[in-house]
Regions:
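Sec-dependent signal peptide recognition
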Residues: 1-7
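Hydrophobic h-region of N-terminal signal peptides that target proteins for export
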Residues: 8-17
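Sequence/structural signature of beta-propeller domains
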Residues: 16-282
Length: 282
């Protein structure tokens, strides 16, 4: 029996490959930046990575707009958000679909646009009202998406900053989304300004500009590591001021944007070879 279990484990390892180790945030250091974001002068508010286009998408608060960027921060195109209000977060959902968070309205707005589209209408978009207590200065500030569970994560910015799981109703239902408070997520942070969910490794990244850090938690909100965004830490000469958006690409590079229009790129530092690695076989 033990022999059969061993063979089964070996076969599973060949099929799925070894479990991928999750790089801890405290292993990251600045690789590039600050870089001025192309086509943006102010109010960069949210960030997401589009894996199929290998692009970054940034949402602006004023004017209400999305800009698509190359990974170096250069502008590819602009998409106007017609009749949207107080847009503070964005997340890619797959294909040409995105979700945009409206801070004061407390809405998750579902939008879809083709590669050549230059605008999106709020009136024609599907809205999910989170029914989280928000106002013009303390509303939804970040959004992330779990494609496997098909649920969202949203953040309330400050004065009891918090992360909520948002479970949408079934397509045929008129019910409101279900909001579940993640009581452990972001505990001790002065505010929450951005979110990213890494579905591959089942971890949530929580950005705080007032606490100047990114916190890594598991899917239940329990912290496992953090990246410090202060001058003298993580390869930074100066503290990142007003960090507003965060995302990972498919190479595990970490992107942070800050107001008014700056982009920072962090990468995992190369591990130093151990004595056994350097000795090798002779």
């Amino acid at each position: 029996m033990k022999h059969l279990l061993t063979v089964a484990c070996l076969l599973l390892g060949q099929v799925f490959g070894p479990a991928e180790e999750s790089p801890r945030l405290d292993q990251y250091t600045l690789a590039r930046g600050p870089v001025v974001i192309g086509g943006v002068s102010q109010n960069a508010s949210g960030l997401t990575y589009h894996a199929k286009r290998d692009s970054l998408f940034v949402v602006l608060d004023a004017p209400q707009r999305i800009v698509e960027l190359d990974l170096d921060g250069s502008l590819k195109r602009k998409i106007n958000l017609n009749k949207f209000d107080d847009t503070e977060g964005i997340v890619w959902l797959g294909e040409n679909r995105f979700a945009v968070a409206e801070e004061a309205r407390g809405n998750i707005v579902l939008v879809e646009f083709e590669p050549k589209d230059g605008g999106v209408s709020w009136k024609k978009a599907t809205k999910l009202n989170t029914e989280i207590q928000v106002n013009a200065t303390n509303g939804l500030e970040g959004i992330a998406y779990d494609p496997l569970a098909k649920r969202y994560f949203v953040a309330r910015e400050k004065r009891s900053p918090a992360v909520f799981k948002i479970i949408p109703p079934k397509p045929e239902s008129d019910a409101a989304p279900t909001a579940i408070l993640m009581s452990l997520a972001g505990r001790g942070l002065r505010d929450i300004s951005g979110l990213h969910y890494d579905a591959k490794r089942k971890r949530l990244l929580i950005l705080s500009h007032e606490s100047a850090c990114v916190v890594e938690t598991n899917q239940y909100g329990i912290e496992s590591s953090r990246l410090l965004l202060r001058g003298g830490k993580s390869g930074l000469n100066r503290t990142i001021f007003k960090a507003e958006g965060i995302s990972l690409d498919n190479r595990a590079r970490l992107y942070v944007i800050s107001e008014p229009n700056l982009l920072y790129v962090f990468q995992k530092t190369k591990s130093q070879p151990t004595d056994s690695d350097s000795s090798g076989s002779k």
